[in-house]
């Protein structure tokens, strides 16, 4: 290419020695023929063994017991929050809904919320749209608050 010509896309090519063909094995004696890197005679020369095969030994997946029971697809998993955390987030108390907890980053909006009774409170909470354990309910009501699940 002359110095005054403009370099164009169709003129580009890889540098010499930059591209090397992959070795094609088993294509004749002159180029890795015969055993083609598979070693001498035997099972793995002729074919492959399936995943989990242990050479005829009783495989692990058959030695272990079968799984029993079932998983309930309708199980409800609650996000839990303790009274101590509620007091941290809302020190003044007042009405607390699930949306307020989501806004503060305490829970996510993908599962229902349950309040547990770890911690103490002296401020009154009015909790809306959450479940509460018996101990949490008694502590909140003792402080002058209330819990409603709707």
Swiss-Prot record:
This is Large ribosomal subunit protein uL15. GO terms for cellular component: cytosolic large ribosomal subunit. GO terms for biological process: translation. Belongs to the universal ribosomal protein uL15 family. Residues 8-32 have a biased composition (Basic and acidic residues). Part of the 50S ribosomal subunit. GO terms for molecular function: rRNA binding; structural constituent of ribosome. It holds the Pfam family Ribosomal_L27A. Residues 1-55 are annotated as: Disordered. Binds to the 23S rRNA. Keywords: Ribonucleoprotein, Ribosomal protein, RNA-binding, rRNA-binding.
